[in-house]
Amino acid sequence: NVEYLRMDMSANDLTVIPCDCAICINAILTGSLEKRINFFQSLSLCINAGGELVLVVPSLESKLYTQIIADRWNVDDAENDELPKGKEATQKISNIRQGVTDIDNVPTKHYLKEELELLLSLEGFEVSLVKKINYGWGTEFHKPPKWLKGPYPWDWMVTARKIN
């Protein structure tokens, strides 16, 4: 039997019924460290030992790669982007140190591959697979150059088994 449950896994007072499988696609995106910690702890609580997790999250490596391309070849007029100043600059520096970068002006958590492996292992998961899920340049740029091919931007997909 399959049952679909939609819930805020980052809530402080979450009540979960353990299951055998969880699929989380772009679900752990909050800029809040506290909410991300809650989310990963809730994942651990809601999956039975031996259960499977499929997780898809934005890649920090891909975000940086995309930014390097934008800056180097002035994609979408990147050279005219205004640099933040004062408190905004301080906040952006603090965010990037945690892998939080803006998507459409919304602070969004992006993950390193090794970071995901560590976070999941600390919550009792054994990572089975980490794979790049590629997507087109049109998701990153309004006007991607015609010459721009692969490697393409990507999200991370992780499969993991709950071991304890």
Predicted feature locations:
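A short SAM/SAH-binding and catalytic strip from SAM-dependent methyltransferases
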Residues: 20-35
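Acceptor-substrate binding/catalytic loop of class I
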Residues: 31, 55, 100-115
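Short alpha-helix
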Residues: 106-124, 129-130
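Conserved SAM-binding strand-loop segment of SAM-dependent methyltransferases
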Residues: 1-11
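A short acidic, Gly/Pro-enriched loop at the edge of an enzyme's catalytic core
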Residues: 12-22
